[in-house]
A protein has these predicted regions:
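C-terminal "cap" of GNAT-fold acetyltransferases
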Residues: 120-145
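Conserved active-site alpha-helix within GNAT-family acetyltransferase domains
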Residues: 101-127
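Short amphipathic alpha-helix that is part of the acyltransferase structural core
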Residues: 1-27, 41-42, 47, 138-140, ...
Length: 145
């Protein structure tokens, strides 16, 4: 039904991320070092239905973006994308990875822990955003390997 593969087209993924509620500028390069990206496409026609990116921020591995089109959620695509990012972090010698979660429950099921903001590296602009604490309540999370 679908396949996940590496991609160098971060720009294409930004549109998917934006369309699925991530606060990212569509069509813009990342401000950080993009380590690797993955796309999930349908086998039938190659339509882009999911994606993820792994970046280096403040010297740490960060799962920067993960998104799956609404109608394909529940098929474990997000889980598989997270596994790719975690495997790549470990392959590169990373002892942990970080993320900023809009849906922390998804990540806790995958073994990620919520971390107090003061204990986390500076990996996000969320806490200076005008939406923070109003209609957006992100959590910084970490997974040790």
């Amino acid at each position: 039904m679908y396949r996940i593969r590496e991609t160098n087209d971060y720009i294409q993924l930004t549109y998917l991320f934006y369309d699925n509620g991530l606060e990212i500028e569509p069509g813009a390069e990342s401000e950080h070092e993009v380590v690797k990206c993955w796309e999930c496409v349908t086998q039938k026609n190659g339509a882009l239905i999911g994606g993820a990116s792994l970046e280096i921020r403040a010297g740490e591995y960060v799962v920067a973006d993960v998104a799956v089109e609404q109608k394909y959620r529940g098929l474990h695509i997000g889980v598989e994308l997270m596994e790719k990012a975690e495997e790549e972090t470990k392959r590169r010698g990373g002892k942990r990875a970080w993320l900023v979660a809009k849906v922390p429950g998804f990540y806790t099921k995958l073994g990620w822990d919520i971390v107090e903001r003061r204990e986390a590296p500076d990996i996000s602009k969320c806490f200076t955003c005008e939406r923070y604490g109003k209609d957006c309540h992100p959590q910084i999370m970490r997974k040790n390997f």
